[in-house]
Structure formats: C-alpha cells, structure tokens
A protein has these predicted regions:
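N-terminal leader/signal peptides at the extreme start of proteins
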Residues: 1-26
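Periplasmic/extracellular, small/polar-rich flexible segments of pilin-like filament-forming proteins
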Residues: 2-3, 78-203
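Residue-level recognition of hydrophobic positions within alpha-helical transmembrane segments
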Residues: 20, 26, 56, 68-69
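N-terminal single-pass transmembrane signal-anchor helix
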Residues: 22-53
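Alpha-helix exit/C-cap motif
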Residues: 50-56, 69-88
Length: 203
C-alpha cells in the first residue's frame, strides 16, 4: 500500500503542466504566419478571378470577329464584294459603342451613326445574341487596292497587310478599354488574308 503513494504523487505533479500547455494554444508568431498565408491565398484568388473575367471578355471579341469574318464571306458570295462598313480601323469608329469600356455593354442592332456613308451593320448576315462589351470595325476594298490600315500590332508583333491586294479584302477589328485606370486598350484582329485571330492585350 505504501508503494503506491509515490506513483500517485508523480502523476499529480505532472497534470497541471499538461493542462497549462493545452490552455496556452497558438503563439503570436504562429497566428501571424496563419494570417500571412490567408492573405497570400486571398491575393492569388483575386488575381486569378480578375484574369478569368478578362479572358471571358476577350473571348467575346474573338468569337465576334470570327462571326463577322463568316458574315463577310457570305456577303461577298452573294454580292461579289465585301462590306466596307466602318470609316476606318481607328478610335471612335467602332460599333455599337464608339468608346467601349468594361464598365458597360451596348445593345447590337441600333442604327449606326458613325458608319461609312451608305453602309449599315444590318447589311451583313450577322447574328448577335445580346449586348456586347467590345466595339467592332470592319473595312474592305477591291482587288488592287491597298489595305487600310497597312499594318497592325499584336503583343509586339507587327502584322503587315498587302499594299496592293491581288483579291478583294477585308479587315475586322474589336476594341475595348478593359482597364479603365489606364489609357491602354485591348484589340482583336482578323482579315481575309489569314484565318488567324490576333489579340493585342496590354495586361
């Protein structure tokens, strides 16, 4: 019976230390590390979300310029000419908005007040599902005429168009200010000389 007393005393002596250790919880350093990790993950999530949204906006433009290309080819097959709808591939010439930004979308189908003389977008067999964010331009010419503009730039690469095209031609452009805090704009191009779509995105 006497032999059991020291053993019980030893257990009793250790118990407060164990309880005190559990009660202490995380240290300040450990909490700071957790906060930093959460902050980093939050930043990565926001950046990833913004990139995803931007890519979805650009996909609207790439799909639309391809649709305009198909509509131009259908129009040419019927009339033997491409539709020279826009006054140019230039700022202020786009439709349905002359100053498109990511802050709003604009309905397609309204009368084009800044189109080339006598032309309207409704002349193209083009189906648009709803309002669009980008503004769109398309210019065209006959064989032997020079492309206007003669070239465009996409992410540092210069794309040069023929000075005297051997065939009838067209150029399609989409433009939008996706980041309204800077003057840089995003452009998407295609043309009758290539099936490629070029994206010039400053981000």
């Amino acid at each position: 019976m006497n032999n059991a007393v020291p053993f019980i005393g030893t257990v009793a002596a250790r118990t407060p230390a164990v309880r005190r250790r559990v009660a202490e919880g995380f240290t300040l350093v450990e909490l700071m590390v957790v906060v930093v990790i959460i902050g980093v993950l939050s930043v990565l999530a926001v950046v990833g979300y913004r990139k995803l949204i931007r890519e979805s906006h650009i996909s609207e433009a790439t799909n639309m310029v391809q649709n305009i290309r198909v509509a131009q080819e259908a129009y040419h097959a019927e009339t033997q000419q491409y539709a020279n709808i826009s006054t140019g591939i230039a700022d202020g010439a786009s439709y349905p908005s002359a100053t498109p930004t990511s802050n709003f979308v604009t309905a397609w189908g309204a009368n084009c007040t800044n189109c080339n003389n006598g032309w309207q977008w409704t002349q193209l067999p083009l189906h648009v599902d709803g309002p669009v964010m980008f503004g769109y331009e398309t210019v065209a010419g006959v064989a032997g005429s020079a492309a206007k503009p003669p070239s465009v730039t996409a992410n540092g690469q210069q794309i040069t168009f023929p000075n005297a095209s051997p065939t009838d031609w067209f150029i399609v452009d989409a433009v939008c200010d996706l980041d309204t805090t800077t003057p840089a704009k995003t452009y998407v191009y295609t043309s009758s000389w290539s099936n490629q779509v070029w994206v010039d995105d400053p981000e």
